[in-house]
């Protein structure tokens, strides 16, 4: 599954992962939490990132909150995570060109 991975203080990078729960948990370093961005696009973060005082990553105005720890942008189809679309991939990459 094609995703965009964004670590704190780093530029985003496109990655290919298995799409299994464990692969997402490995990337976010713990239990996952889904944050809806828009139809067909979601953000997967560490559910306990703030509790574990993970490093700040970026501010997400849609939910008026600071995202901490590693974040993974994924596509969505219903309740399933999918490859991020070409247009969403481009949008995410452009948004995070500056670290």
Go through the PLM ranges and name each one.
Residues 1-99:
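Domain-length accessory/inserted modules outside core catalytic folds
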